């Protein structure tokens, strides 16, 4: 009599095991879907469309320039101003760049009997030349340039009619100039760029001494500007 009872118990257990998955599936199907508490996060890359295929760009920065206002002057001048530059790209790597820069400030003066101390001085550059796009990716780039042109030096504004040689200054003049350096660019979007521009600034001024004799002087100084560049949407 024990065998039938055991078989009956075994059959009951098997029936429960078979029915359990079916009940679980039914409960799972009947449960309504739950919506997420927060919306789905979508990442957007602001630099995804940086391709370096623009035709034009324009940059403006706050500028610094070190210079000497005279050939034998011991004290240098630290000038501040603006750097406005633009480029026309002929290909991916080569372009033509033009730059206009204005630097103003004061300078030390040579010993004199006219009580002239710290007079105003200024340099205004207008140069153009070749530009080369070096290593670059969507985050930034390195660009080199070599530009040539002229500079107007304003040295006599505060001399009150005193000859510039009295304070070891150059006279007011337009002189040959060159700017060689480049740009360090950090892309902020497809069109906007944070730009740092360090340069070597070369000038070739003429000075006149008390006897009227003239001589030319070749100077190399450091300049840097920090600002923003805008790349126009027009493509090559």
Language-model segments: residues:
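Short sequence motifs at beta-strands and strand-loop junctions characteristic
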Residues: 52, 76-79, 120-124, 170-177, ...
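Gram-negative (and chloroplast) outer-membrane scaffold detector with strong preference
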Residues: 87-165, 173-181, 186-188, 225-231
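Transmembrane beta-strand segments that form the barrel wall of outer-membrane beta-barrel proteins
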Residues: 58-70, 96-103, 198-202
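Short glycine/proline- and aromatic-enriched beta-strand/turn motifs that initiate or cap beta-hairpins
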Residues: 24-88, 229-236
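Predominantly the C-terminal beta-signal and adjacent terminal strand-loop region
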Residues: 189-236
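C-terminal segment of classical bacterial N-terminal signal peptides
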Residues: 16-24
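Extracellular loop and loop/strand-boundary signature of outer-membrane beta-barrel proteins
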Residues: 45-46, 68-72, 109-119, 161-170, ...
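Bacterial N-terminal signal peptides that target proteins for export
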Residues: 1-11
């Amino acid at each position: 009599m024990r065998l039938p009872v055991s078989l009956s118990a075994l059959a009951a257990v098997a029936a429960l095991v078979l029915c359990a998955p079916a009940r679980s599936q039914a409960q799972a199907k009947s449960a309504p879907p739950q919506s997420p508490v927060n919306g789905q996060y979508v990442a957007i890359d602001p630099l995804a469309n940086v391709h370096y295929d623009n035709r034009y760009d324009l940059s403006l920065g706050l500028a610094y320039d070190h210079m000497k206002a005279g050939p034998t002057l011991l004290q240098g001048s630290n000038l501040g101003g603006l750097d406005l530059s633009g480029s026309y790209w002929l290909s991916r790597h080569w372009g033509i760049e033009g730059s206009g820069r204005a630097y103003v400030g004061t300078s030390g003066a040579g010993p004199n009997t006219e009580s002239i101390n710290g007079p105003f001085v200024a340099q205004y550059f207008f140069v153009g030349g070749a530009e080369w796009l070096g290593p670059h990716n969507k985050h930034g780039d390195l660009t080199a340039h070599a530009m040539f042109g002229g500079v107007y030096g304003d040295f006599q504004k505060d001399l009150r009619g005193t000859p510039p040689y009295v304070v070891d200054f150059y006279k007011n003049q337009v002189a040959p100039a060159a700017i060689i350096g480049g740009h360090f660019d950090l892309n902020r979007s497809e069109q906007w760029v944070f730009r740092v521009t360090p340069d070597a600034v070369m000038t070739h001024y003429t000075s006149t001494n008390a006897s009227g004799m003239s001589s030319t002087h070749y100077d190399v100084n450091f300049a840097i500007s920090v600002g923003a560049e805008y790349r126009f949407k027009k493509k090559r």
